[in-house]
């Protein structure tokens, strides 16, 4: 029961961060965006979509627990390319507005 209380507290602490806009503060490169390989995302803004350290009510080990969605304007593309990156909380800051 104690463990489930800890998990519930962890989920409750993360819940207000979901949906908030963030800016990447750490120098980070991602390689999984097909339209922009070797992309430096430092300074980019995105939205926290999910906290992944709790899954089906159990704690899981996630080194990068915040799933953040980004949009990238790519020349020649009518719509921005959407992609996700998993970040640690010390790699981004919350952006007001």
Swiss-Prot record:
In which compartments does the protein localize? Answer: Plastid, Chloroplast
Q: Which GO terms describe its biological process?
A: photosynthesis
Give the chief site where it resides.
plastid
Query: Which GO cellular component term is one of those annotated?
Result: chloroplast
Cross-referenced SUPFAM superfamilies, in alphabetical order?
Electron transport accessory proteins
- Spell out the InterPro entries in the cross-references: Elect_transpt_acc-like_dom_sf, Fd_thioredoxin_Rdtase_alpha, FTRV
The UniProt GO MF terms for this protein read: oxidoreductase activity
Enumerate the UniProt keywords alphabetically: Chloroplast, Oxidoreductase, Plastid
Q: Which family does it belong to?
A: Belongs to the ferredoxin thioredoxin reductase alpha subunit family.
- Briefly, what is this protein's role? Variable subunit of the ferredoxin-thioredoxin reductase (FTR), which catalyzes the two-electron reduction of thioredoxins by the electrons provided by reduced ferredoxin.
Recorded hits in PANTHER family, A to Z, give: FERREDOXIN-THIOREDOXIN REDUCTASE SUBUNIT A1, CHLOROPLASTIC, FERREDOXIN-THIOREDOXIN REDUCTASE, VARIABLE CHAIN
**Partners and quaternary state?**
Heterodimer of subunit A (variable subunit) and subunit B (catalytic subunit). Heterodimeric FTR forms a complex with ferredoxin and thioredoxin.
Protein name in the entry = Ferredoxin-thioredoxin reductase, variable chain
Tell me the organism: Zea mays
Its ancestry begins with: Eukaryota, Viridiplantae, Streptophyta, Embryophyta, Tracheophyta
